[in-house]
Amino acid sequence: MQANIFVFAFLLLSVAVAAYGYQPECLEPSLYGCRGDEDATFGWTFDREDGGCRQGSYCTRFGQPKNYFRSEGDCKKACGGA
């Protein structure tokens, strides 16, 4: 009985730690800009390949993607990275 309680507590703690560090917007595709003369909005994005924040843009007509941050500080705060 006591072993079951310890296993349950360990699993609960593991799930809590995993959920706390999860930032879904950081897992979205990075911003890669627009083609031609389309209206673009510039900002910051988290690049999973490099593991850091970089400048990027998105086409305004498609709406704001989830992996968009107004500043480098906002990006680093949400996703970490260099």
UniProtKB/Swiss-Prot annotation:
Motif interval(s): Cell attachment site: 35-37
Keyword field: Cell adhesion impairing toxin, Cytoplasmic vesicle, Disulfide bond, Hemostasis impairing toxin, Platelet aggregation inhibiting toxin, Secreted, Signal, Toxin
Cysteine pairings via disulfide bonds: 26-79, 34-59, 53-75
Expression (tissue specificity): Expressed in salivary glands.
N-terminal signal peptide: 1-21
A cellular component term, taken from the record's GO annotations: transport vesicle
Superkingdom of this protein's organism: Eukaryota
GO molecular function terms attached to this record: serine-type endopeptidase inhibitor activity; toxin activity
Alphabetized SUPFAM superfamilies for the sequence: BPTI-like
Transmembrane portions of the chain: none
InterPro entries, per the entry: Kunitz_BPTI_sf
Keyword Disulfide bond: yes
Localization (cell): Cytoplasmic vesicle, Secretory vesicle; Secreted
Function: Tick salivary platelet aggregation inhibitor that plays an important part in the anti-hemostatic strategy of ticks. Inhibits platelet aggregation induced by ADP (IC(50)=130 nM), collagen, the thrombin receptor-activating peptide, and epinephrine, although platelets are activated and their shape changed. Binding to platelets is similar for resting and activated platelets (Kd=50-70 nM). Acts by specifically binding to platelet membrane glycoprotein IIb-IIIa (ITGA2B/ITGB3) in a divalent metal ion dependent manner.
Protein name: Savignygrin (-)
